[in-house]
Structure formats: C-alpha cells, structure tokens
C-alpha cells in the first residue's frame, strides 16, 4: 500500500496502482467503523466525472457495507452537493470520490465524518491494521438533494438585472447542476464543456491555471457576455473572467465578497497564506477580523468553524461562505452570489476591482520535487535560508514578509511540488523578492530546476 495516498486534506493517488480494490475496501471499512462508533449506520457517497469512479465506488461501498453501514448514493455530483447532503440529509457523514484537479489518471476521497472534514492521515494507521474485508450483502440506495439545493440557491441569489454569463465546467462534475442553477436565478446562460467526461477532452479542469481559460475567454468575448465562471473538476473551486477576457485573481474575488458580507454582518474572515497582503487590510477596514491559516480546504473549514467566521477563501479558488450558508467550499453557490452582487451594481467587474490597491504579484507557481522529500526540503530551506530585514511566518512552509513585498515557499499536500507565490508594491519589489527566493533555492538545492509550472 502506498502510504503517500493518505494526505493532510484527503486521500489521493493513482486510481489503478494506489486505489486498487483491496485498498479502497479497507478504507471503506475503516470509515464505516468510524460511523458505527458514533452510533450511526448511514453515509452519503458521490463521485465526479473521472473514468475510474465506478470501480472505486463499487469497492468503497463493499467496505462500508462490511462495517454495517448503508450507503446513500448521490451519483455523479460536484463535491459541494455531497457536503450539502451531509448538512440537510438523514446523516452527517459523506465520502466524495474525486481527484479534484490532479491528472486524469488519479482519483481520491474527500471525507466528512460527523459533520467534520476528515483527513487521510487521520485514518491511515487504522487502514494499515486491516488484514482483509469480509464482503457483506449490499446496502445501497439512490438519493438526491438537487431540487432542495436549487430552491435554496434561487432564494438567496436571484439576479436583480439580466446578465449574460458563460460557464465552463471543464467536463467535470459541475456542468449540469451549474447550468440549472444559473437558469433558476434568471441568468442568460451560455454553457461550454458542460457534459461530464473524465477524459477532459477540451482542457484540464483547473481554473487556477491560465492555460485552461483560453476557451472561456474566447467565448465570453465572442458572445459579448458580462463575465464568466470556470469550475474545477469537482466543483469546489471557481475562477472569474471579465467581459474583456481578463482573469480576476482569487484575492480580488475574496475582497468583493468581504465588502459585501462585512456590510451585512461583522466577524472574522479566514484566508490562506498564499493570499495578498492587501486582503487583511481590507478585512480590517470593513470591520472584520483577518485570520491567516494554513492552505487547504480541510484547514480553512476547521478554522471557519472554530472562529464562527463570516467567510473564508483560498488563493487557489476555494471560497467558503458561512453567513446564511454552510461554510463549505461551493463554486456554484459562490458564482451565483457573485453574480447577484454584480447584478446589484451599476459598474463592471473591472471597475469594482479597480477600487482595490494595485499590487504586482505572481500566480501560484509550482516546482517539481520528490513527493517523499518535499516536506524535509522545506525544513532544510527554513534552516539554511538567508533573508535580510525580514519577518518570518512559519504557519505553513515559510512566508517572508518585507516592507513592500512578500514571498512564500511551501510543500503541496496534494502533489509532488513546491508551491511559491510572490507579491510586491511595485514591479521592482516583486522582482526583488522573487530573485531573493531563487538565490536561496539555488544555493540550498543546486540541482533543483527552477522551471515553474
């Protein structure tokens, strides 16, 4: 068994080699035992559009059933629908079979037990103890919360004026539901790559990468649309594109939402270490309390619950709305609320964002590293790095803060990569902090390629 599949947020690996029949059955059995220990015997399961979904589903059900737990099958749904079911349904446990934005050969499991996110690391040792799973009679029933979800989103996000909106689901799990939602809120919807297809024939469903947005940008301009939304493979991350085909950063998406929600209710706002330095300033300016947290939907959700936060957000596009909603990352609901906000304004997105302080930043940058060594490499970087006149933040990897710039280096929890990001008040400030990090990387890891992806 490949122990690297048990990660800090979830379980993720190659569908064929790592998530084989035996491994998935054991995982299902352990999860079932956790449910039974809470004196419950039911769980929701859903899956995204990946080609390996049904084989993994079959074996997960076998493991859960072997523990005496009945499975309510949500079918092919975006991850937020699984979360929604655990909030509204007859039990508060769920497993989503999804590879998120990993390569199409991968898959994984996002887990909710007793209304709380559960990481792969939390169950790893128990899975390793299981020698075999005795398959029982099937306990399986199909169910759906789509109609209830549509009604609730419509009640909260109906548009104040007509807007033409392009949706690109990237052939992931969000397409059919997203189109229905936007029709319900009275948008003029143009959907592309709507049909779920685990081959991802048009582009990879990762809206954080500019190369995956070429198609939606072209469609927005050709159709004269007001704006558009791109979703990731399982519908928990969103990208926003303007009428001129410009991508709006997640920093600015979170800022738009902060202005809106902090005008309704004051409270904490949680954000991850990759976010702009301007975000906590804006949160404070509008009467909120900024809370920086480790990257990862798992960490942000727990922090939102601990602090009863108004909302949370990550630079990767995970947005968590908690005021009048449920605090989980839901790209479709977030997109609907953003559309409502924009329908109430008499300005464009570009004009709205132009109000925010201008900085110069990179997108998320990745460097390939060995999966087994990445965390130790970050620790070595921290112990050997040399930065002058810097404030060091070690909440997640290392974030170096200087007067007019900052930089971040951390190990990805979901793939064999370093994650970096840089921001400066000027282009020169940005270049300076980036070059300072690269000098340290070259000195400490002379064999490491600085070919960013």
Q: Residue spans of the language-model regions?
A:
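An N-terminal, well-structured beta->alpha segment
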Residues: 1-62, 66-67, 93, 142-165
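Gly/Ser/Thr-enriched, mixed-charge loops and adjacent short helices
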Residues: 105-223
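Phosphate-binding and adjacent anionic-ligand microenvironments
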Residues: 265-453
